[in-house]
Amino acid sequence: MKKPLLAALATLALTGVGTAPAVASSAAPAPAAAETARAVSFAGTVSLSNCSGSVVRLPASEDDDPALVMSNGHCLETGFPAAGEVVVDQPSSRSFGLLNASGSRVGTLRAGKIAYATMTDTDVSLYQLTSTYAQIRSSYGISPLTLSDARPTAGTAITVVSGYWKRTYACNIDGFAYRLKEGEWTWKDSVRYTSACQTIGGTSGSPVVDNATGKVVAVNNTGNEDGGRCTDNNPCEVAENGTVTVRQGINYAQQTYRIPACFGLDNKLDLSRSGCVLPKP
């Protein structure tokens, strides 16, 4: 996983190795590839205490619905969910720094609850805010990003937008991992980036935006840092026939197109809805 930054800093203090890029990168220039994706801005992205995220709406969301913030399951303030664990409707008062198009913080949003979170099959957290989309737009002039309900395709030009670092990473979808295994967790049908997206610690939870549509197609979550095989911070790809592939320096995201089917009226989570395949508690 692209470790939450606080954990990465703690590891660095103890060991002096392993997570230095998460610290050093604050002064590093943005990747040159980002120059090709200027149309994708920071508007609607958020910074968490340890990760990145975004204010998102579903295709059927209405302006008076409570807004949602999406990040990774491993970015929860309560720690990493165990394999098989699903968090639903858990109270939360977490705060998020809302960014405008240029990456400046324009306000603070607050959660009322964790609507859904897991690290099983996918790595996602969805917070329900105390504000509606209309209230956010009225107060800050910021609209949410829209989650696509269509599966992305290989070759798609994408931008990973980190609200924590206020940096973007532009590349393409290289392909998909049938299973991506990291430590005790396994994720399905993960997005593999081309090598240009060198995401770092703190970019966890960043929205992955389809440059052509402007819609969110995935949430950034991990990468193989050291060439390890299926260990923490060193995920491996497992093919349908069981073949294991390690791609050192390659980073990954989890697809989000299945999320809209699990929410109904008023942005209310309903895991029993037809077409909803997210893991259940």
What positions do the PLM features span?
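Secretory targeting and sorting signals
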Residues: 1-28
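Short glycine/acidic-enriched loop and turn motifs that connect beta-strands
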Residues: 76-79, 224-226
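PDZ/PDZ-like groove recognition
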Residues: 244-281
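Conserved catalytic-core segment of clan PA serine endopeptidases
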Residues: 31-42, 47, 57-61, 77, ...
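Short glycine/Trp-rich loop-beta-loop segment that forms part of the substrate-binding cleft
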Residues: 144-171
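Active-site region of chymotrypsin-like
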Residues: 40-42, 47-51, 135-142, 167-259
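A glycine-centered beta-loop-beta connector
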Residues: 60-67, 210-215
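Extracytoplasmic
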Residues: 48-50, 64-66, 70, 91, ...
